[in-house]
C-alpha cells in the first residue's frame, strides 16, 4: 500500500500540477492604472502588466485572462515563478532567506593553538661551555719622592707625585 501511494506522489510530481491555474493570472485593469498613475501614459503595445497581484499598494485585483503578445515559442520559454505554492506534498515549499541564529558567546571561546607555543619560543641550547673571561684591572701606584733642590732662592720641600698605571690580567 505504501509503494502505491509513493508512486502516485511521484506521478503527481512528474505532471507538475500547480495549486493555481496557469491560464488565469490576477491583473490590475489598465484604465484604473492610467487614471491612478498618469506617469504610465497610453501604451498601445502592452506586453506585460504594470502591476501584479503582489503589489501591496493597489487595493483591487481582478481575474483576467493574460494577453500574450509574444510568439508561442517565447511563451514556452517563460518560467514558473519561484514563489508559486505547490499543492503536492512531494514538492518542496518555496525557499526563503532565513537568518542564521547567532550562537551564545560561550560558544565563541577559541582555545589557544598548540602549534603556536612551539613556534613562538626559540630553541636555546642550555648546555653552554663556560669560558674564563679576563678582566683587566688598573691599579695606580703613587711614588712620593722628596727631592731637595739646592737653589739660591728658598728651599721648599715639595714632594713630587708620579702616577703609573699597571694592568694585570686576573682570572
UniProtKB/Swiss-Prot annotation:
Pfam families according to UniProt: Casein_kappa
Show the disulfide pairing: none
* Record-annotated site: Cleavage: 107-108
- Identify the glycosylated residues: 123, 133, 135, 138, 144, 151, 167
GO CC annotations?
extracellular space
Question: Per its UniProt entry, which superkingdom is the organism in?
Answer: Eukaryota
Q: Which InterPro entries match?
A: Casein_kappa
Instruction: Give the UniProt subcellular location, in the record's own words.
Output: Secreted
Tissue-wise, where is it found? Mammary gland specific. Secreted in milk.
* PANTHER family associated with the record: KAPPA CASEIN (PTHR11470), KAPPA-CASEIN (PTHR11470:SF2)
The UniProt entry's sequence similarity note says: Belongs to the kappa-casein family.
* Name of the featured protein: Kappa-casein
